[in-house]
Amino acid sequence: MSHCFTAVFEPCLINGKTELLRHNTRLWFKRPESPSFEGTCVGAVVGLNPGSAKGDAEIGRETLGNCDPTMDRILTTFEIAFKLKGLPVPEGAYVQMLNLFYLRDACASAAIAARDEIAQLLTNARDKAEEREFPFLWLAWGKSARADDVDRFPTKSK
């Protein structure tokens, strides 16, 4: 399948330098007709921060981009799960990519340092997609997460 993602990249001033935040990231199993295509969400993944993936369009607009290795790994894992269940990946399906914080930086340690120094990265720069409900939420990050990182993600009570 031809994996890709859609997202909105927004500028953010950090220590006098313009950095990018990546919001509403959707990982697509197959390239959608347009960046604003709605599609069907099959689940959500929470990662640490946006890595190196870049979009094709201008800042502040929905854009298409090529998946980075982490995004490809996530989609491949979902494809394996569908295959093991004996189900096809639904047409127009995507995985919503959420993050503990949304500063795009290929160097995770630099992004973590910025997050710890600048509280606005957690409070003012959240992704509106976090407010949605998803079929399930896969928490996928390492030791760098803090205990309070998970608190803002809604959970369904049984």
Each model region followed by its residue ranges:
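Glycine/proline-rich loop-helix segments at beta-alpha junctions forming the active-site rim
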Residues: 105-158
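Conserved acidic residues
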Residues: 41-42, 93, 133-137
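A short mixed-secondary-structure module that forms the rim of ligand-binding clefts
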Residues: 54, 58-81
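Short loop/turn segments at strand-loop or loop-helix junctions that form parts
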Residues: 43-51, 98-102, 139-143
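Short connector loops at secondary-structure junctions
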Residues: 82, 88-110
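Amphipathic alpha-helical interface surfaces
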Residues: 66, 70-74, 96, 118-121, ...
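Structured alpha/beta reader/binder surfaces that contact nucleic acids or chromatin modification marks
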Residues: 64-65, 84-89, 130
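Active-site and ligand/interface coordination hotspots across diverse enzymes
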Residues: 1-63
